[in-house]
């Protein structure tokens, strides 16, 4: 990157890592459920998650009992899974508390589900939004020939996380002058 008037330059003061999915919203008979997995949790900066192991059962969804009758099964998109609660896996309550520290809204935490890493991948890939777009010719206002395309997008309520590394501007100079930030 060049400085003002292209007299010198240096790399940016902020570096961004790849973005990862932490909580993925999926339609269910109970409304949207935000799904995560041990792998997604381990990738966060929360120290307690770094040692999180596999789930006791791989083909189930773990949900907090919310005071009403616990669903025996829950559909996550097209996938129909048995439901287990914190009675079956004590770490579920701790996970909800630790996620709350990240500033995640209570509504999302109350609709939290944890699935195995393998199921998480399938759930995310099967529930991406497919969007269709077309390029419009500005001269005619009509669609351009062969310009219809589709793409997959994350649903609007997806909770993402990434790391930002901020460098101290005092460690940089432009033309032997300190950087003012």
Question: What do the PLM-derived regions correspond to, one by one?
Answer:
Residues 1-181:
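Basic, Gly/Ser/Thr-rich N-terminal segments that form RNA-phosphate-binding interfaces in CRISPR RAMP
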